[in-house]
């Protein structure tokens, strides 16, 4: 159903496609080109930036909240990076 590709946007990690049609981009990349760390990259292209720190993961959810609109960038970040 979903296909993930390295993003064509310089400040995003992934582009999401649904049935071949672009849906959304998600995951942050700093202005210097370095990806922000995530808890665990389930897609795997940025797994060297996994931190696996439970407390940091909890702080992320405290800042951003646990609820996300279906098929939004936040939804995919929560499902595939956090």
Give the ranges of each region predicted by the language model.
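Arg/Lys-rich, low-complexity, intrinsically disordered basic segments
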Residues: 1-82
